[in-house]
């Protein structure tokens, strides 16, 4: 099996299904008569910029990110670790307290990521308010941030 075809199938499966484990990808590939090991799938996942993110149901599933999206994600992780002082949450609101002069940077990075759980954000000098549609959406954002920080 050619690597390109196998990786094309992996991309297709990740887009079509909520896949939690690499073993599931091995099973789906086998149904297409593509026999591979979990180690091969693991290498393919790295090469394809596939990463785990929380699903609507709170499960950690694989998703493919573009290179641009991946760079923004890396910038957000770095900045959050450097400048976040405290995160408070209530209902569908998340308040991120930062070192002075840094809240707007966090807001810009959140906007660039365009996470569907976020309706918008309002930032001042040292505080960024992230607004979600619902408490469950905010909890997904909170889980993502906790994985980062």
From Swiss-Prot:
Q: Which InterPro entries match?
A: Arg_repress (IPR001669), Arg_repress_C (IPR020899), Arg_repress_C_sf (IPR036251), Arg_repress_DNA-bd (IPR020900), WH-like_DNA-bd_sf (IPR036388), WH_DNA-bd_sf (IPR036390)
Places the protein is found: Cytoplasm
State where it is primarily located. Answer: cytoplasm
Its pathway?
A: Amino-acid degradation; L-arginine degradation via ADI pathway
On whether Zinc is a keyword of this UniProt record, the answer is no
A cellular component term, taken from the record's GO annotations: cytoplasm
Looking at the record's lineage, which domain of life comes first?
A: Bacteria
Q: Which UniProt keywords apply?
A: Arginine metabolism, Cytoplasm, DNA-binding, Transcription, Transcription regulation
Membrane-spanning parts: none
BP terms from Gene Ontology:
arginine catabolic process to ornithine; protein complex oligomerization; regulation of arginine biosynthetic process
Pfam families, per database record: Arg_repressor (PF01316), Arg_repressor_C (PF02863)
Q: What does this protein do?
A: Regulates the transcription of the arc operon, involved in arginine catabolism.
In the record, the note on similarity to other proteins reads: Belongs to the ArgR family.
| Name of the protein in question | Arginine regulator
